[in-house]
């Protein structure tokens, strides 16, 4: 059997990615594709934990612009991530992979509370663990939650699934001459304000020397390639 380069990963999925071609909500095709790709790497023996955003349902920051109190909006966003987490859990378990959802805000009838040791035990037993409700605190993004959980779970890498094939110096959709980075340092990301993750998440990863790989998850098979050590997308590394 092939041996994975990364044996323990944190996969960060954006809520928007789950929409597919829809304007909001969850595309059954997209979530089934993610589940299939996740099963592929679990079958290789990789320990997989996941954090999903909630932007396909509600985003706290844009809610604040529409008159929703920021703290209330962020709590609404956290609940949106739990909806996405349950949907992904359902899709992964349909493929026969045992999956647990742990939330930063306790909701015992829906999911387990986040307990580090329990989460690690699930991973050791070959279960996928999905972390919902962000960090449980307003003003912190799901990117920061992903960095935090990755550090707590002692993962080898944070893998950020996006709609583009890496990190560019400017928006490749708007600017055809945008330059793609193969590798970039944490400090460059912060200094150039490259839209990878927010500054808090990048700082956490830098402090803990946790590499970040940004890749296009819309092409099936890419997640497996990343885990096997194939260089696709962009890697954020230490200086």
Curated annotation (Swiss-Prot):
Binding site for UMP: 54, 74, 135-142
Keywords associated with the record: ATP-binding, Cytoplasm, Kinase, Nucleotide-binding, Pyrimidine biosynthesis, Transferase
Listed EC numbers: 2.7.4.22
CDD domains: AAK_UMPK-PyrH-Ec
One Pfam family, short name: AA_kinase
Main location: cytoplasm
Entry keyword annotation includes Nucleotide-binding: yes
MF-aspect GO terms: ATP binding; UMP kinase activity
UniProt key word Ligase: no
Catalytic activity: UMP + ATP = UDP + ADP
Residues engaged in binding ATP: 12-15, 55, 59, 162, 168, 171
GO terms, biological process: 'de novo' CTP biosynthetic process; UDP biosynthetic process
Pathway membership: Pyrimidine metabolism; CTP biosynthesis via de novo pathway; UDP from UMP (UMPK route): step 1/1
Gene3D superfamilies given in the database record: Acetylglutamate kinase-like
Family: Belongs to the UMP kinase family.
Function: Catalyzes the reversible phosphorylation of UMP to UDP.
Protein name: Uridylate kinase
Taxonomy of the source species: Bacteria, Fusobacteriati, Fusobacteriota, Fusobacteriia, Fusobacteriales
Gene (UniProt): pyrH
């Amino acid at each position: 059997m092939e041996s994975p380069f990364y044996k323990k990963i944190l996969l960060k999925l954006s809520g928007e990615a789950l929409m597919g071609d829809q304007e909001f909500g969850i595309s059954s095709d997209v979530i089934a594709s993610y589940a299939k790709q996740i099963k592929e790497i679990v079958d290789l023996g990789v320990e997989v934990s996941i954090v999903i955003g909630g932007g396909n349902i509600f985003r706290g920051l844009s809610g604040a612009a529409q008159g929703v109190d920021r703290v209330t909006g962020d709590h609404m966003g956290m609940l949106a991530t739990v909806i996405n987490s349950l949907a992904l859990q359902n899709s992964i378990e349909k493929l026969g992979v045992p999956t647990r959802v742990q939330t930063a805000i306790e909701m015992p009838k829906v999911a387990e509370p986040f307990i580090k040791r329990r989460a690690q035990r699930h991973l050791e037993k070959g279960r996928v663990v999905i972390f919902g409700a962000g960090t449980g605190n307003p003003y912190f993004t799901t990117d920061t939650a992903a960095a935090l959980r990755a550090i707590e779970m002692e993962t080898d890498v944070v893998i950020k699934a996006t709609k583009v094939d890496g990190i560019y110096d400017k928006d490749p959709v708007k600017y055809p001459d945008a330059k793609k980075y193969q590798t970039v340092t944490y400090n460059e990301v912060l200094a150039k304000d490259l839209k990878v993750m927010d500054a808090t998440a990048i700082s956490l990863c830098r402090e803990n020397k946790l590499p970040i790989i940004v890749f296009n998850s819309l092409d099936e098979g890419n997640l497996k390639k990343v885990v096997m050590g194939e260089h696709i997308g962009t890697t954020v590394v230490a200086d």
